[in-house]
Every structure is written in C-alpha cells, then in structure tokens.
A protein has these predicted regions:
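N-terminal accessory segments that position/regulate proteins before the catalytic core
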Residues: 1-457, 464-518
C-alpha cells in the first residue's frame, strides 16, 4: 500500500465519531474568525448577469425528457448558475441574516467555488475564465485570451471548474471537515446537473486530468493572489449532447496568460491550521483513474410544478414534524427511483441502508437499496448473517430486519431528532477499501462526490413531492458500520446520512428575496 492510501485510511479512521469521542474540532464557535461565505476577486472586471426568475422552465416531472437545448448566451449562462449555485433566499431571525443557496452545504458554510471557462461570446471576441460570485450574481473576469481549444468541442460547449476552500468547513467542524468539503462538491455538481437539464444541456465530469492541471486552469496555483488555500475539485464539460469524459486540455493550458486578474478576498482575520486536512488534501491530489461508465438516470415522474420553483424552495430542515411525516408508498418509490441508477455516468459504488419509520405499506425496519447488483453477493456476505434479505415492492430494495429503529437512528445520528422523526433516514454505504486499492487515493474524494450528488438529488426530489430533506454529516461511523450492519472490516463504509419527512417551519424566521436590489 502506497503512502497516499495509508494517509487516506488513517484520516478516515481518525475522523470517525464514536460514543466515546467525536473527531477533533476546536470545541467552540470562534465567531471572530468565521470565514466569509462569499469569495470575490478584487480588481477583476464584473459582468452582471440578468436574473432568471421570470424565465419559463419545464415542469420538474419532465426534466429527464429530451428537452430542446437553449443557445449558449448570457441569459442561459445566468439561468444555469442562478438555479444551481445562486442564492435562493435570505433569512432573518433575532438580528441575524444569512443566505440560503440552491446547492446544499454542510452547516451552510459553502466551501465550493465555481469557475467558467467560456468560448468567445457575450460581445467578447476572446475566450475567458471567470469566477461566479453568487452574492451579486455576477461573473468576475480573471483572464481573457485567444485559443482554438473550443473548436475541439461540440459547438456551444464550455467548461466549469469546481474548487473548495476547506477552511470554511474546518472553522466549525475541525478535522472531519474534509469529508464535508467533498460532500459539498457533490452537492454543487448535482445542482449544476439539474439546472443544466432545464436548459436541455448535459454535464460530464472530465476523468483524465490532474488536480494540478485544474489548479493551473483556474489560477489557483498563483498563490500570491490568495490568503486562504483553495484546492481544485473537478472539471465539468457542459454541452448539448452527452460528452466523452476524456478531454485533452493541453492546448487550452498553453494559451493561458501567465497571471490572472483580481486578488481573492481574505475570508478570515486568522485561521486554525488542521495538519491532518492538509495531509489528506495532498494524498488525494493524485491523477484520477477513470471508472467504468454506466447509464444515467432517466426518471418518469407524476406531473409537477416548474423546475425553478422546486430548486428555489430546497431547504435544509432542522426539525421534523413527526405527526405529519407519514409518506405514501408512491412518494417513497419516487425518491428511490430518482437515485436508483447512475447520477454521474459511472457505475454506482454507493448503496442505501434505510431506517424506515413512517412509510405506508412498509413495515418499520432496516432496508437496503442495492444500487449496483454486482455488489449484492458481497453485501450478503459482509452484513449480519441473520438479515432476512426479503424482496419488496421496489426492485433491489431488501428488508433486512423488522424492528423499530427510531431510537437507534437518533443515537447513530449524534442524538439528532431529525433522524428519527421523519418518514425515514438512511446511511450511504460505499464500496471502500477495495475501491481505493484498485483506483488510488483520489477515489476517496469521488466516493464522497457520489454521496453528495445523491444527497442533492434527494433534497430536490423531496421538495418536488412537498416533503423536506436534510443531510446528516454527524453520525457515529462504526455504530452504523459494525453494530447495525455487522461489518467486520472496511470493505464497506457509511459516508453520509440523510433524512426525509415533513419539516417544521419556524414562523419567527423571516424570508427576503434573494436579489432584492437587482
């Protein structure tokens, strides 16, 4: 085993929560150093984007149909960003104000940043690299240059680079923050996928480039422009047709200017360094190894409201209304169908262990949604030998144990009522040790990205059904892995938890428009 894999395995074990101890953090909220959730580049030219609130969008139920493709113009770029990474609303309570975005984020801390690499357009005869500033709904132009690179892509295609500032999560969550950073990258990716579908566009992650190349493309290697480190996550191709995940960007890199415009704003007056995060960031920055491809999800849904209304109303709920959280079998099946097949075009590596509490026609108990049938034999071998593996009305959903898991699910989720008071909660069970050994340490991030994509999809799908969802990053890892599932090794690990039900709306919290002055 190489040193990078050793670092990843050590990081994961060290940052597990248990009944004896939680992963290390400061142990208090250091409000004086709270990071600014909005990155801006001082000195960069701003392109104000038009708001898309009045743009018609297809019903959410039709998003997986072959919708007509919008042209690549400023209006469509604006809509893509507003309905994925933009602000959905502002909230006010007890003198405090905070933004709610379309993409979910652990603790609403938003470590993810987005950069667009665009061909000549928007009355500009040069290609450009710009940063999306969601607070002002604007593009900050970092570089303008000539290149023939876009001639190698399908017409009207462009690139989006995602990056992360780990300090935003580490400020609150300490050494476990790297996990949440990767989940949020997955949240953002799937938010972009959903928004792109409204425009008849497709998004594919490039899987044959290095983190170093992405950093160079986005200007993240120009360290004098940054106070806090910002690390590359992924490069996405946005196109009208499904693209190949393999892309040669050498000509693009050759055409980049040596220095970009704009200086990144300082997010905190000071920082607390977490060496273990720096170590795992370095270990996972290896060249990625492409995964086997798979058919993407295409879900048939009941008629629903406009897509934009669904994504703009996505919220993370802190309290579930237990008495109202009974859901129908059809709602349950719709949620499962939405994430049953591949979201990222790769073979699924994540399965769902569900604590079913209040679902009509389903007995209370522990269930497993097997998202890749290739793993079924292995899962049966590794889980408790006493499990039933009884087939249900939903294909690839198995009843493992009949029991009331409301108390257990709450304990596992760091004693949070949201895990027990909804219709169901779940743990995302990932192929783990063999997966990392086969595909190297970069795969650790990719597993979290897949979990984040599932989480964002469940958020949006629940919203479309009039329900609420909430991601749960705080859970007792091995209480789930070992006690509940019976795992005796690390072939599988639970990486992210989630809950769905009917959320309590606090009338004391006021809502304001996302962009009131625009």
């Amino acid at each position: 085993m190489n040193k990078e894999l050793q670092t990843v395995f050590r990081y994961h074990e060290t940052t597990k929560h248990s009944q004896k101890r939680y992963a290390k953090s400061l142990g208090y909220m250091d409000w004086a150093t709270q990071p600014d959730p909005f990155r801006i580049y001082k000195g960069a030219k701003n392109i104000k984007l038009p708001l898309s609130l009045h743009n018609p969008t297809a019903p959410y139920s039709l998003l997986d149909e072959d919708l007509p493709s919008a042209p690549l113009v400023q209006k469509s770029i604006s809509q893509l960003l507003q309905f994925s990474l933009g602000i959905a609303a502002w909230k006010n309570s007890a003198g405090s104000s905070w933004a709610v975005r379309c993409n979910a984020s652990s603790g609403n801390l938003h470590p993810t940043e987005a950069y667009l690499i665009l061909p000549s357009m928007m009355e500009n005869n040069k290609s450009m690299i710009s940063h999306y500033a969601p607070k002002n709904h604007a593009l900050e132009v970092l570089a303008e240059f000539d290149t023939d690179f876009f001639d190698t892509l399908e017409k009207e295609s462009f690139l989006i680079g995602l990056s992360s500032i780990a300090w935003r999560e580490a400020w609150k969550y300490g050494e476990r923050a790297f996990r949440y950073v990767q989940l949020d990258a997955g949240h953002a990716w799937q938010a972009l996928v959903i928004s792109a579908k409204m425009l008849g566009w497709n998004i594919t992650r490039v899987d044959n480039i290095t983190d170093e190349e992405i950093a160079r493309l986005l200007g993240l290697n120009q360290q004098k422009r940054f106070f806090e480190e910002e690390k590359p996550d992924m490069l996405l191709i946005v196109s009208k047709e499904q693209s190949s995940p393999s892309l040669n960007i050498s000509s693009l890199l050759d055409n980049l200017p040596q220095n970009y415009e704009g200086i990144a704003n300082k997010l905190s007056p000071s920082m607390h360094a977490w060496e273990i995060i720096a170590e795992v960031e370095k270990a996972t920055s290896l060249m990625q190894i492409p995964q086997p491809e798979a058919k993407r999800c295409k879900v048939t849904r009941e008629p629903s409201r406009e897509s934009k209304e669904v994504v703009l109303n996505r919220r993370s709920i802190h309290v579930m209304e237990k008495e109202k959280s009974n859901i129908t079998r059809e709602q349950f099946h719709t949620l499962l169908k939405s994430i049953d097949c591949s979201l990222d075009g790769k073979e699924n590596a994540v399965h769902l262990a569900l604590f079913v509490h209040r679902v009509e026609e389903y007995a209370q108990g522990l269930y497993l949604h097997v998202r890749n049938s290739k793993d079924l034999h292995s899962l049966k071998k590794e889980f408790h030998s006493t499990f039933l593996w009884q087939e249900t009305a939903f294909e690839n959903l198995y009843l493992l144990e009949l029991a009331d898991f409301t108390a257990a699910s709450k304990i596992i989720s760091c004693n949070q009522d949201i895990a027990s008071d909804g219709a169901f909660s779940l743990g995302m069970i990932c192929r783990y040790s063999k997966e990392l050994l086969a595909f190297n340490a970069h795969r650790y991030k990719e597993l979290y990205w897949e979990c984040g994509m599932i989480g964002q999809q469940l958020y949006v799908e629940a919203t479309s059904l009039g329900l609420s969802g909430t991601g749960i990053g705080c859970f007792l890892d091995d209480l789930m892995n070992t006690n509940v599932l019976g795992l005796k090794n690390n072939l599988y690990q639970s990486l992210y938890h989630f809950t769905v039900g009917v959320g309590y709306v606090d009338s004391r919290i006021q809502t304001r428009a996302a962009y009131p002055k625009m």
